[in-house]
Amino acid sequence: MNEVLALNGEIAKGLILALGNGRRQVAKTVCNAILDLSISQAGREQLCKALSVERLLSLFYQEVQVNRVLAVHQGMRKEAVECSKGRPMNESFVALILAAAVTLINSSTEDFLDRIPSELVKRCLPLLQEIWKKSRCPLLHGNGQRCWHIMKNGLPTTIFKLSMNQNLATWNYDKIRVTMFGDAGSEFVTFVSKYWEKSPVLLSEAIKNLEKENGVFRCLINSFNHQSTNDILDSVLMKLVSCQPLASDELDINCFLNENSSLGSPLIYGLDIRVVKAQQVSSESFKKKEVHFFDSSSGTLFSEGDYATKCKKAFQDGFTIALRGMEFRFAEIASITRGLADLFGQPSVGANLYITPPGSQGLTFHYDDHCVFVWQLFGQKYWFVSSSPTSILPRLYEPISSLPSIENEKEGGLQMFLNEGDILYIPRGCPHEAHTKNDAYKPQQELCSGLSLHLTLSMEVEPPFAWEGFAHVALHCWHEMQKEASDCIPSMEARRRKVFSVFLLHVAIKLIADDVSIFRKACLIAAKFVEHHADTLRLNQKANFLKIINIIDFSSNFMETFEKTVVQEANDNFLEWMRWLRHLPQRGDEDVKIDFDDPSRMRSELIELSIKGNEEMKDEFFQTKSRFCRSLVYEEACRMFQVMLEKYRRTRNQYMNGMLALHT
């Protein structure tokens, strides 16, 4: 019966008209009817077409003005108590409105949400955020009433979805460049050509304008209350929620939302926060190990307020507090990471915060698989950066086993104290450690002067945005341009051989990149350089790419590639690295497309094709490789790369906007 009613659009329109009746009892009945109709997808679609979300949000705004949020919260607490005593609870009008709105918004498409008037969203969002924060009261846990359950569990998703396409403030990339590297455009050029992904450098001279008016830095430090140690810890730790990670190759924010039903949940240890210190293994050894204050293997969920008290105790005991994903929690940090990502032509930049007490070390001697800019915000910290990086640039999440021992690496490295405002650049693969000065003689109330608070801005070079990734984009772009010629080939088998020769060349590029560092370097084609330096640097980027093409031309090995794909690596995971290529456009019939979404199926079909004639496959591979290396169009590849970059940025910004709204 519900399905039949749901398909009748006039019923939905009639319900929405009745919401404007002006009588509360009628409106309550309508909200209950909307909830019943929303059980089916057809009902939700008809209600959305009837502009029910706009009407519900308008009614919600009228009912709950800013100065009445507290009263709403008090009513919720009262009803929660009544429920806990086993008495029947009359669900409030606000709860009914919210439950209906939440149900419809959370099941709506992005296109539909974009049609909700932006001014209405701006008016309602602060109220929704305030009610959600207050609804996290422990008294409401276990409340069984339908509307409260829908509202409490669905409201974080509603806030996320209404916020994800909002335009938030971002520091212009040029302002970030001047703040971090200096006024002259040549200073950023010098950094890129001399230090980027090569060697560490202290950028203190660029930030000496602390004595002047540095808007970026001042805005950053003013986001923390730094009157005392407790104030700093409170400003950092309170009111945080978990930021479940977004898959690096996920470009549909709705997939993330559908797979994560725990938006707004408490912090998770190891994912959002770590509380750690480095301790010597023994008095005879310089070697240290990391000790966690909490159980590092349990994935503990921290309840509101409880974890902050425990973290303060850990801090007094010498533990460093490390918070991940600060760009999702503080708008000031988000605006900096967006500007920095734009400057370097990357989809996003991460930000972690480290608070270390006096005389302590948080992390042991280690290297990162990403480049970092260490920005000292408060206090001082001593850094040692080794002069012996790893033999090859590490890829993200691919550990390199050979880490130099700290005993052998103390000579010849970079050693310095970072003062407030200083920025230290550390390339990926460069081992380092840091500790604070010992101020144990100072009384507890003065420990703020000895603590260190620094922000690390993480430049993670993801596979699509390294030179290896650009080579894959260039090959894909070239293959798309060849499809008209393939249409003239009458034989299905011959057309498939051409497709699989391109597929194997993608694998060959990956195998070459495993051993050749230039393929692992960040592709800076989309980076923002000062105008009078831009042409020279663009030529340098093109020269890098031509080197890569020459390496592909001379180093591609059919037998090695074929054996790795078909014989030696018979497991399904070997080809998973190429799944990000599914985001690139493909045209034509299915027989001229590569199934990047299911590379194991491609492998199975390749085996069948090779049984019929491996020599033909080998000849086709070398012909494809030669034609690609000699006839690719660099400018077309740049355009496709830029389009892909913007797709990644859009999803990352949606995620960032949504998470920031849950921390506002």
Which positions does each model-derived feature cover?
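A generic N-terminal leader/anchor concept
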Residues: 85-329, 336
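Fe(II)/2-oxoglutarate
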Residues: 1, 7-181, 195-199, 402-417, ...
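Active-site region of the double-stranded beta-helix
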Residues: 192-194, 235-422, 430-495, 659, ...
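Residue-level detector of secondary-structure boundary/capping sites
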Residues: 6, 47, 194, 211-213, ...
